[in-house]
């Protein structure tokens, strides 16, 4: 369980408390000391950097399907495997990454929006973005968590979608994730090295989903090509 994952991440659990509830809950408050010259920030990408995603999306939609008893075992197992896979390998190559954030409650679009700064914009290709198997089928059937709908409503003014992107696909991009992957901003100089390293280390393929550009009207452009 949680203790196993903390041990894998070399984290000590000190204290804690339990609550009584109909729905199981588990969370951690993280404290520690770090070297300030090793910090990866979410607002420091550079123009022409590639945007990398290290895990497929879809855990919010799938966990909503689980609550409605609409999720098959294979999809459930895939989601659990993804959520219990740690994002620890990135620390080994942090000096080759310009910016980094995890994809969690604000969905890919929300966290990518936070990375856009200093007149930088993100251009991503929907067709390059990986999803857990069965996510699209569930989304087409309107199995969308409230948080994902709220995400899209909040960020939509900062995003321009290609006219071919359907509404359910927008929800998939805004899907609130639990233990999602990382969004990385990497220069052309290091892109091949970073992708090769992560794909050799991780069970999920790291994919390039777009680039950071500049001087556009919106923070994010979602294309179909």
Task: Give residue ranges: language-model regions.
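Helix-biased detector of long, well-ordered alpha-helical tracts
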Residues: 1-225
């Amino acid at each position: 369980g949680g203790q196993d994952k903390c041990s894998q991440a070399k984290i000590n659990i000190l204290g804690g408390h339990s609550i009584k509830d109909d729905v199981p809950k588990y969370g951690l408050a993280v404290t520690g000391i770090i070297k300030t010259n090793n910090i990866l920030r979410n607002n420091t990408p550079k123009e022409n950097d590639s945007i990398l995603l290290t895990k497929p999306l879809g855990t919010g939609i799938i966990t909503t399907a689980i609550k409605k008893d609409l999720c098959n075992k294979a999809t459930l197992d895939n989601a659990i495997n993804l959520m219990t896979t740690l994002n620890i390998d990135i620390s080994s190559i942090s000096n080759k990454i310009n910016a980094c954030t995890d994809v969690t409650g604000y969905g890919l679009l929300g966290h990518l929006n936070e990375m856009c700064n200093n007149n930088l914009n993100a251009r991503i290709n929907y067709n390059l973005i990986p999803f857990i198997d069965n996510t699209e089928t569930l989304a087409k059937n309107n199995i969308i968590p409230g948080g994902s709908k709220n995400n899209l409503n909040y960020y939509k003014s900062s995003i321009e979608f290609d006219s071919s992107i359907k509404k359910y696909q927008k929800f998939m991009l805004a899907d609130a994730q639990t233990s999602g992957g990382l969004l990385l901003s990497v220069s052309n100089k290091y892109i091949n090295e970073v992708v090769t390293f992560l794909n050799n280390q991780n069970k999920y393929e790291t994919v390039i989903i777009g680039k950071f550009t500049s001087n556009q009207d919106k923070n994010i452009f979602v294309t179909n090509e």
